[in-house]
Amino acid sequence: RSSGGSGAGIKALLDGTADFGLVAREVKSSEKEKIKNYQEYKVGIDALTIAVNPNNPIAKIKDNLTSDQIKKIFSGEYKTWNEVDPSLPATEIVVVTRDLGGGAHEVFQEKIMGDTKVTDKAIQAPSMGALVAKIIENENAVGYASYGVAKQNEGKIFALKVDGVAATPETIVDGSYKIQRPLLIVGSGELTKVQKAFMDYLRSDAGQKLIEAMGFIPVK
């Protein structure tokens, strides 16, 4: 596959430059309808954790945020931490996101924000690594970090529960942790021999390790 994010994979299928691609988001019904003999295979799941700096008092006082609180934080309606919880200090909330046109933000927008825009004061990080670095360096920062990156930085960032549910491989796979996106192989028509071999590889132990290395939780 060529890189270029999830949108590029679907676009290549739609305009016929590819008959097989990898996308890291749900495929819209309107897109499926335009692809001849549309097929999809789920090979992994990524979740977005709501991450703060471990020195932020919220990590000790309140390890959970509701979807509504997250929405108010990221929209800028809550400007200081004490608006989230009166026992927290009145320090300014620093919101960190990925670029607003990317796949990760699309998932966050859909699962949490709905029609509400993220504050224009948000720092847009060019990568998940850069997003996490901002949280590590700023005690008042909050951002959505993909599960794999959050695991790699355990101890340096703190992942809050969302609506009382912690992000774990179990809650992500069973769907009870809601801020998540699938890693899909999408195609048009029957798999060719080469495509089938690639699918078999992804479902093998080596392939599952590769999916984990990409920061996803493998799904057989």
Model segments located where?
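Exported/periplasmic ABC-transporter solute-binding proteins
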Residues: 1-220
